Amino acid sequence: RPLCPDGLVSGNGEQRLITSGAPYSDTLIYQNIHFILPNANPRVTPDTADELESVRQAIIKKGSYTDSQPYLDVYGYHPGAQLRIRQEEREYSGFMRYTNYETAEVGVRYTDDKGQWDRRTFTSWADGVTITQITSSDKEKPVTAEFTFDNISSFAKFGDGSEVDIRYKKYADKDGYMTFVAHYPSYEGSELKEGGYATVCYIISEGADVKTTENGLPDEKQYAGSSNPGLKVKKADTVYVISVSGRT
């Protein structure tokens, strides 16, 4: 049961990304192939030894057989952090989302009264990170954008599973680092009850400073932080977002 909406995808086999490609409120959903979400079901191996002979005979006789064991003990994949990039909304035209199969990039291109804008993302195999580039417009208008992590409760299909028992925090500093760190549910018998996951984003702003912002605390029991910070870039020539996700 996926927790991610449709979008453009990028990845290198371990690090993965889904981006919505919206012009002024884009979302970048970071993933890692090792992210699996525990559930509260018993972690026991089913005893199926007494079914072996009947299954063998069914195969030999080309008959049918039914597996009545429910797979409730299987852990499912889950997303990492969901980064939101906000820019001032304007009337726009020429909107296009694209995948460049030669460069392995996904991106969005559109035009407003400040010119044509291009935002592109790819996941590096050599470096094991995802990189997003936001360049100034073709009219040389600079980049102004705000970066925040979305709350878990806003994720697609939230509330249908054990994600309601995750606890998480957000961090950001003036050096350009943003971190989303979460603790898995502490279910009895779970191999991951002491573990969690994190997504770290490093924002590089050419020609402008990075400043911290403060947003209202999330109104949800999952949030364990004392603040809800983000970062803002104003009038930059180019902005890079370098991101990586992993288990903790």
Locations of regions flagged by a protein language model:
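Aromatic-residue-lined binding/catalytic grooves and analogous aromatic/hydrophobic interfacial grooves
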Residues: 1-248
